[in-house]
UniProtKB/Swiss-Prot annotation:
This is HssA/B-like protein 35. InterPro entries: HssA/B-like_chaperone, HssA/B-related. The gene is hssl35. One of its GO terms (biological process) is sorocarp development. It comes from the Eukaryota. Residues 1-25, 63-97 are annotated as: Disordered. Residues 84-97 have a biased composition (Gly residues). Residues 63-75 have a biased composition (Low complexity).
Length: 97
């Protein structure tokens, strides 16, 4: 189980979901696929800020690799996925990974 998050470059918040976030949590690579998924599923208005925060905080905190996607699909926490984004069925049904 690799808990390692590396955010390469996050564009300005509120831009298109094209920021390069390379994060690896629990052996699942979260590259451009995750950005497209998280932007559509979690950030309703496509806010990279929420997506970046959710991915970064969750990965650093534990094995919740898809915080932005998992947490937002449930409670709409806009990237504050501290405990909701569990990398299981939630992530799968949301991102389709």
């Amino acid at each position: 189980m690799t808990l390692f998050s590396s955010i390469s470059s996050i564009s300005s918040p509120m831009t298109s979901s094209k920021s390069s976030i390379a994060s690896f949590g629990s052996g699942t690579s979260m590259g451009s696929n995750s950005i497209a998924c998280g932007g559509g599923c979690g950030g309703g208005s496509g806010s990279i800020l929420g997506l970046g925060l959710g991915l970064g905080l969750d990965l650093t905190g534990g094995s919740r690799s898809s915080g932005a996607c998992g947490s937002n699909r449930g409670s709409g926490n806009r990237g504050h996925g501290h405990g909701h984004g569990s990398m299981g069925g939630g992530n799968g049904s949301c991102c389709g990974i």
